[in-house]
Amino acid sequence: MATGTPAAELRELSEDELVTRLRESKEELFNLRFQMATGQMDNNRRLRTVRHEIARIYTVLRERELGLAVGPDAGDAA
């Protein structure tokens, strides 16, 4: 079963790492959509998994923006 990264694991990453993961996931989603359009797709479930992972990353970034959650670097500053 294809599973994405749990939100708890994403919350442990720095903002730069999250942005990098987001970029990589978007590239993968683009490639998967291209494979789907050309009929080369083997695992249709992977599309959904990658979309959900992108949503999780956006959620973690938004939580930090609103101050609902703090990143791993913020605890060291106190």
Swiss-Prot record:
The protein's GO terms of the molecular function aspect are: structural constituent of ribosome
Q: Where are the transmembrane segments?
A: none
Instruction: Give the matching CDD domains.
Output: Ribosomal_L29_HIP
In terms of Gene3D superfamilies, this protein maps to: 1.10.287.310
Instruction: Say yes or no: keyword Hydrolase present.
Output: no
Q: Which Pfam families match?
A: Ribosomal_L29
InterPro entries, per database record: Ribosomal_protein_uL29, Ribosomal_uL29, Ribosomal_uL29_CS, Ribosomal_uL29_sf
Keyword vocabulary terms for this entry: Ribonucleoprotein, Ribosomal protein
Example of a GO cellular component annotation carried by this entry = cytosolic large ribosomal subunit
- One GO term of the biological process aspect: translation
Family in the record = Belongs to the universal ribosomal protein uL29 family.
Protein name from the UniProt record = Large ribosomal subunit protein uL29
Origin organism of this chain?
A: Rhodococcus erythropolis (strain PR4 / NBRC 100887)
